């Protein structure tokens, strides 16, 4: 019983980690795209706030 439970927990943890990794890489991609488009005029908050008209 304990080994089955441990295997189940391991699978759940791996699934969560895989999902988080995908989310993070997607988020990093969107941040770098935004930053390039706006020449880096973005706040470092989540979600990033950007000012395309050049305000700080």
Swiss-Prot record:
Residues 26-39, 54-56 form a propeptide. There is a cross-link at residues 40-53 (Cyclopeptide (Gly-Asp)). The keyword Nuclease does not apply. Keywords: Disulfide bond, Protease inhibitor, Serine protease inhibitor, Signal. The record marks 44-45 as: Reactive bond. Disulfide bonds join 42-50. One of its GO terms (biological process) is negative regulation of endopeptidase activity. This is a cyclic peptide. Residues 1-25 form the signal peptide. One of its GO terms (molecular function) is endopeptidase inhibitor activity. The keyword Signal applies. Inhibits trypsin, cathepsin G, elastase, chymotrypsin and thrombin. Does not inhibit factor Xa. This is Trypsin inhibitor 1. It comes from Helianthus annuus.
């Amino acid at each position: 019983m304990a080994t089955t439970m441990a295997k189940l927990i391991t699978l759940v943890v791996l699934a969560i980690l895989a999902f988080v990794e995908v989310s993070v890489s997607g988020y990093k991609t969107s941040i770098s795209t935004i930053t390039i488009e706006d020449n880096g005029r973005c706040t470092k908050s989540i979600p990033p706030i950007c000012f395309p008209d050049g305000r700080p």
